[in-house]
From Swiss-Prot:
Catalytic reactions of this protein: 2-(N(omega)-L-arginino)succinate = fumarate + L-arginine
The species this protein was found in: Macrococcus caseolyticus (strain JCSC5402) (Macrococcoides caseolyticum)
Signal peptide start and end residues: none
PANTHER family: ARGININOSUCCINATE LYASE
Descriptive protein name: Argininosuccinate lyase
A molecular function (GO) term: argininosuccinate lyase activity
GO cellular component terms, semicolon-separated: cytosol
Length: 457
């Protein structure tokens, strides 16, 4: 095998098996643009501080830009024996412009180089995830406004509980996503710090200007400690943690959609574009996209725990274990972006079976709390009202009727002060619009909630 760029101290080259085990180019090739961006900033700084000449800097920068052109034209092949994206690019540069290309790495280690690449990539991907979350939030708001009068059963323990507005239920996910978005935005503060100039771990003897490279790369600051800069990946774990919460919320929403589009619920109908069929059962229309998103939430959880376990026992400073920070991280980023984008399209094209939803609450016992509350207004203590209502529900079940079908005379046998207005109180629309608390399910409250959500956007 060819001698490695770091091979001056070695008498023997790696075996092919060891080189293949050691390489990471198949994973970190993704950092191609970030690596060149960081190198151009570094070389620009080397020129500014007179560590290299203007002519040398121009040759290197032009060479790097030429490598980008070659790459985009499909004329670049990365080599495993060069280990990673950093050495592959450096080798390409030296081949293109000669020995002056070797000056690019002056005052820099691969340790601060890869950390810089990862910070740049993490920042870009975090911003992309935030943008994708916003798009989904817009769809949720639109869906809520479109169906703001539709009543559905609300659930606890997956049992019908109380009538609520469909829009109130759907807006729940807007606020979950809003917190997800806030976590990603807040995390940018920890990502937007430059490790460049930290060297392998101890800094450098060259008169570099780290604040200048930080500004060129649009970082807010420079790491205060060079060891910290190259040895930790907490900002990666931070993003992966946030992805886990995001995917958990999408998984919960997916689970509901899976239930809702079943024959047993029939709350919604998914577009054909987001479903699949069966190879043996012709009638099937499967919510595979929702199921995949639900399943992938487990995958990103595994990625997160994998990196957490990798880092937890590492001594300072850099260790090769940190090469394992990328595969699960990149997969989690891809999964999050794809999942949010697919989910956005699925919800945007989803049909709400409004008439069916409203009919359900007209024919169940989700209005039982209204009856208990009504009895309280007659002076009956709530615990007694709760007991009486439970007995009335049991009476209705035994007689195969609903609360609205119980004769007034029977109600008055419970309490003589009950009047005909009890039937109005039992109406689901009346029940919904009595929930006037600021965050309740009344039409007024939900429309105010939607208006508040639009302000966040």
């Amino acid at each position: 095998m060819n001698k490695a760029l770091w091979g001056g101290r070695f008498k023997e080259s790696m075996s092919e098996q060891v080189a293949d085990f050691n390489q990471s180019i198949e994973v970190d090739a993704r950092l191609f643009y970030q690596d060149i961006k960081g190198s151009i900033a570094h070389v620009t700084m080397l020129e500014k501080t007179h560590i290299i000449t203007s002519d040398e800097a121009n040759q290197i920068i032009n060479g790097l830009q030429g490598i980008i052109e070659d790459y985009e034209a499909g004329n670049v092949t990365f080599k495993k024996e060069l280990e990673d994206i950093h050495l592959n690019i450096e080798k390409l540069l030296i081949e293109k412009i000669g020995p002056v290309g070797g000056k690019m790495h002056t005052a820099r280690s691969r340790n601060d180089q890869v950390a810089t690449d990862m910070h740049l990539y993490a920042k870009e991907m975090t911003e992309a995830i935030i943008t994708s979350i916003k798009a989904l939030q817009h769809v949720i708001i639109d869906l809520s406004k479109q169906h703001h009068t539709v009543i559905m059963p609300g659930y606890t323990h997956l049992q019908r509980a109380q009538p609520i507005l469909f829009s109130h239920h759907i807006m729940t996910y807007f606020w979950m996503l809003e917190r997800d978005k806030a976590r990603f935005s807040e995390g940018l503060k920890r990502i937007n710090i430059s490790p460049l100039g930290s060297g392998a771990l101890a800094g450098t003897t060259f008169p570099i200007d780290q604040q200048y490279t930080a500004s060129l790369l649009e970082f807010d600051d420079v790491y205060a400690n060079s060891i910290d800069a190259v040895s930790d990946r907490d900002y990666v774990l931070d993003i992966m943690h946030n992805i886990n919460l995001l995917m958990m919320h999408l998984s919960r929403f997916s689970e509901e959609i899976i239930l809702w589009c079943s024959e047993e619920f029939k709350f919604v109908t998914l577009s054909d574009a987001y479903t699949t069929g069966s190879s043996i059962m012709p009638q099937k229309k499967n919510p595979d996209m929702a199921e995949l998103i639900r399943g992938k939430s487990g995958t990103v959880a595994g990625n997160y725990m994998g990196l957490l376990m990798t880092i937890k026992g590492l001594p300072l400073a850099y260790n090769k274990d940190l090469q394992e920070d990328k595969k699960g991280f990149f997969d989690s980023i891809d999964t999050a972006l794809q999942s949010v984008q697919i989910f956005t399209g699925m919800v945007d094209t989803m049909e709400v079976n409004a008439a069916h939803l409203s009919n359900i609450t007209q024919n169940d016992f989700s209005n039982a709390t209204e009856l208990a509350d009504y009895l309280v207004t007659l002076g009956i203590p709530f615990r007694d009202a709760h007991e009486i209502t439970g007995q009335l529900v049991l009476y209705a079940i035994d007689n195969n009727i609903l609360l609205k079908d119980i004769p007034l005379a029977h109600y008055q046998g419970v309490n003589k002060d009950i009047t005909n207005d009890i039937y109005t109180k039992l109406d689901p629309e009346h029940a919904v619009n009595r929930r006037l608390s600021d965050n309740g399910t009344s039409t007024k409250s939900v429309m105010n909630q939607i208006a508040k959500a639009e302000q966040y956007m």
